[in-house]
UniProtKB/Swiss-Prot annotation:
Quaternary structure and interacting proteins, as annotated: The complex is composed of six subunits: RnfA, RnfB, RnfC, RnfD, RnfE and RnfG.
Keyword Flavoprotein recorded: yes
Required co-factors: FMN
Protein purpose: Part of a membrane-bound complex that couples electron transfer with translocation of ions across the membrane.
Main localization category: membrane
Gene: rnfD
Principal EC category: translocase
Keywords: Cell inner membrane, Cell membrane, Electron transport, Flavoprotein, FMN, Membrane, Phosphoprotein, Translocase, Transmembrane, Transmembrane helix, Transport
Protein known as: Ion-translocating oxidoreductase complex subunit D
Superkingdom to which the source organism belongs: Bacteria
Subcellular location: Cell inner membrane
E.C. number: 7.-.-.-
Pfam families xref list: NQR2_RnfD_RnfE (PF03116)
Topological category with respect to the lipid bilayer: Multi-pass membrane protein
Length: 350
């Protein structure tokens, strides 16, 4: 009789990688639908461009590496990378930007390290940061939600802006970014940071149309709630574990509450931090990436808490209004160290 000697762990989750990735894609539907509702058809076009680019880039690299193309593409990891990048960029960003970011994410941040399971950094966030640093104007040109927009682009207008930079009537991004008050709009976090630097008081800032009397800004509050719903469904399906999203959100809430209590005239409120920007997307869909996150339960708690702290620090004192992507990548750097000091003790060893 021949016994096969295998290394630990000896218990395994029977779900295949493709199944888990598909669950994440399904869980993203509420967030995608909400972004489509508030920001228009551009989000859908960006997702399609990113998906095609991700599959094509991965297939090309697999062909060069003489790897089985069909079998690897079926794991859905390339699709998920493209999706996460597409929903993170402005819906009317030029078509070549999402293609460039997706190709960079798949080829450089994933396949260059050996493919799925070998990459130390989240590929989608690598692609996002490359685009943000290289094209800061285009990457911060978010449309105002449709309910406060002076002009809401339709299906054909969105398609034309993405591929030509202009609508059928000759309008451009500057026109489309105008709010009902005739002022060019930005995201709630960007508006808050920019207005503070301009010397405006917090009470005055929160009266801007972008906030519309809501806790965290028109549109963005509901987008984050939608991503939260998808994240809770992932927890219920046991596709992800609770440690990272809970520690991330708790740390962000605690830091922002303390900051707001002691410096409310210069720092954002907890509800703005929790329900604006990419908070819920990052908590449940990006930080929980099993490849680039910590692998122990204690390590996951530390990893999530570190990311939450970094998001608050970057948003409050850094040069970028959101900071989730940078926080994720900085936390990814610490994963080997976290895992080293939180790995379970082997029975019988000190």
């Amino acid at each position: 009789m021949v016994f096969r000697i295998a290394s630990s762990p000896y218990t395994h989750n029977q779900r295949q990688t493709s199944r888990i990735m598909m669950l994440v894609l399904i869980a993203a539907l509420p967030g995608i639908a909400t972004q489509l509702w508030f920001f228009g058809w551009g989000t859908l076009f960006q997702i399609i461009l990113a998906a095609v680019s991700a599959l094509a880039a991965e297939a090309a690299v697999l062909q060069l590496r003489k790897q089985p193309i069909a079998a690897i593409l079926k794991d859905n990891s390339a699709l998920l990378t493209g999706l996460l990048l597409a929903v993170s960029i402005p819906p009317l960003a030029p078509w070549w930007m999402v293609v460039l970011g997706t190709v960079f994410a798949v080829i450089i941040a994933k396949q260059l390290y050996g493919g799925l399971g070998q990459n130390p950094f989240n590929p989608a966030m690598i692609g996002y940061v490359v685009l943000l640093i290289s094209f800061p104007v285009q990457m911060t040109s978010w449309l105002p939600p449709h309910d406060i927009a002076a002009t809401a682009p339709g299906l054909l207008d969105a398609l034309q802006v993405i591929f030509t930079g202009h609508t059928a009537s000759g309008g451009d991004m500057n026109t489309l970014r105008m709010g009902i008050d005739g002022i060019s709009q930005a995201t709630p976090l960007d508006t808050f940071k920019t207005s503070l630097h301009a010397g405006h008081a917090v009470e005055q800032i929160m009266q801007y149309p972008i906030y519309s009397g809501m806790l965290a800004g028109a549109g963005w509050q509901w987008v984050n709630i939608a991503w939260l719903i998808g994240g809770v469904w992932l927890l219920w399906q046991k596709a992800i574990r609770w440690h990272i999203p809970v520690s991330f959100l708790v740390t962000l809430a605690v830091c922002s509450t303390l900051g707001w209590a002691f410096a409310g005239d210069s720092l954002a409120s907890p509800q703005l931090h929790l329900l604006s920007g990419a908070t819920m997307l990052g908590a449940f869909f990006i930080l929980t990436d099993p490849v680039t996150a910590s692998t122990t339960n204690r390590g996951r708690l530390i990893f999530g808490a570190l990311a939450g702290l970094l998001v608050w620090l970057i948003r409050s004192f850094g040069g970028y209004p959101d900071g989730v992507a940078f926080a994720v990548l900085l936390a990814n750097i610490t994963v080997p160290l976290i895992d080293y000091y939180t790995r379970p003790r082997v029975y019988g060893h000190r």
